[in-house]
Amino acid sequence: MAITTAESSYEKRIKALFDKQVQMEAREASVIKKVFKFNSNLLDVKEAVVHHHRDVEKLQKVVIQRREEMEKRVSFMEELAQEVEATKQRNLVMREQIKQQKMLVRQRKNEIMESIHTLSKATGTYINREALPARVKGVTVLHGDNRDELIPFDLKATDVEGLDSLCQHLHSLNIDVSQWQQLVSLATEMSMKSHPATPPKDAAKCKSIIEIDLTSPTIQA
């Protein structure tokens, strides 16, 4: 009976040791499985980190490229703004110059018109400015005690001999020929300013008749 009891106790210990061994092997297998899964997950994480770093590098390159493009664009816009401002300033200066030029032209025109009026009244001469600069056409009124004498004239501006003869005649009638010549010159200037686009072919030959020498002998046409 004692032997049976001892064997039973031994079997129990053997069984307990076997069960414990099985449990340890099961735990070891579970740990190995968990370690493998962890290593697999760690490898996936490492690969994900590598891909992430690559994506970050690509993104950084794109950001740098966009930044450089933006800096170039900003620089271009600044240069363009400076050029626009410089153009505005040039236009302002040009407009002011044009304004001053127009003012001087108006002033000169008013001075000429006033001089023409004064000389016309002083010499009693009316100049047909529509005929200028090709022709010197008009009439001089010689005031007398009993009646006025009209001295009409119609000559080509290039007819130096005819103009010389006319000036000699006016001079003989005590008309201030220098004033008469100045009147014709100013009237010619006004006419050429009024029709600058279509000058006559011989306009360059229309010299001021102020150059006529009154001391030279009269040449009859």
UniProtKB/Swiss-Prot annotation:
Keywords: Cell cycle, Cell division, Centromere, Chromosome, Coiled coil, Kinetochore, Meiosis, Mitosis, Nucleus. It comes from the Eukaryota. One of its GO terms (cellular component) is Ndc80 complex. It is found in: Nucleus; Chromosome, Centromere, Kinetochore. Residues 63-114 form a coiled coil. The keyword Cell cycle applies. Its main location: nucleus. The keyword ATP-binding does not apply. GO terms for biological process: cell division; meiotic metaphase chromosome alignment; meiotic spindle organization; mitotic metaphase chromosome alignment. Component of the Ndc80 complex, which is composed of Ndc80, Nuf2 and Spc25. Acts as a component of the essential kinetochore-associated Ndc80 complex, which is required for chromosome segregation and spindle checkpoint activity during meiosis and mitosis. Required for kinetochore integrity and the organization of stable microtubule binding sites in the outer plate of the kinetochore. Participates in SAC signaling that responds specifically to disruptions in spindle microtubule dynamics. The NDC80 complex synergistically enhances the affinity of the SKA1 complex for microtubules and may allow the NDC80 complex to track depolymerizing microtubules. Belongs to the SPC25 family. This is Kinetochore protein Spc25. The gene is Spc25.
